[in-house]
Amino acid sequence: MKLQLIAVGTRMPDWVTRGFEEYQRRFPRDMALELIEIPAGKRGKNADIVRILQKEGEQMLAAIPKGNHIVTLDLPGKNWTTPELASAMNKWQLDGRDVSLLVGGPEGLAPACKEAAHQSWCLSALTLPHPLVRIVVAESLYRAWSVNTNHPYHRE
């Protein structure tokens, strides 16, 4: 199974890239984690946020291979404990499809992305900076993988 993190925003600070890559490289080849960056729409004083969200959403959906299981990261989503995420990951594997996880920009995800989703995951009730979300998602997925494979990374 391939995990695909599709996130709005490019040119992240070096610490974000290093943090994400630290967890990305830990995954085995049969559970690869890929990052796809979608350029953020230009936001200014008179920006048309609805149009920006729509364009970002179109680009995100276009990046998803046909047949992938789609999970949005969104506040109204389900809060998963590590064992619950591990269980969800197990189900994704048994389903036999790759998974695309969508992280929106400053205004969140386009309605089209939310409508296309099969599941929605809420990382926290806190507002997290979008660059940090990449690292938290990568670590959480790695931890869930470690639970499923009895790897010593996760301890109860």
From Swiss-Prot:
GO terms for cellular component: cytoplasm. One of its GO terms (molecular function) is rRNA (pseudouridine-N3-)-methyltransferase activity. It holds the Pfam family SPOUT_MTase. It is an enzyme of class 2 (transferase). S-adenosyl-L-methionine binds at L73, G104, L123, S124, A125, L126, T127, L128. The keyword Protein transport does not apply. NCBIfam families: PRK00103.1-1 (NF000984), PRK00103.1-4 (NF000986), tRNA_RlmH_YbeA (TIGR00246). This is Ribosomal RNA large subunit methyltransferase H. It comes from Shewanella oneidensis (strain ATCC 700550 / JCM 31522 / CIP 106686 / LMG 19005 / NCIMB 14063 / MR-1). The lineage of its organism: Bacteria, Pseudomonadati, Pseudomonadota, Gammaproteobacteria, Alteromonadales.
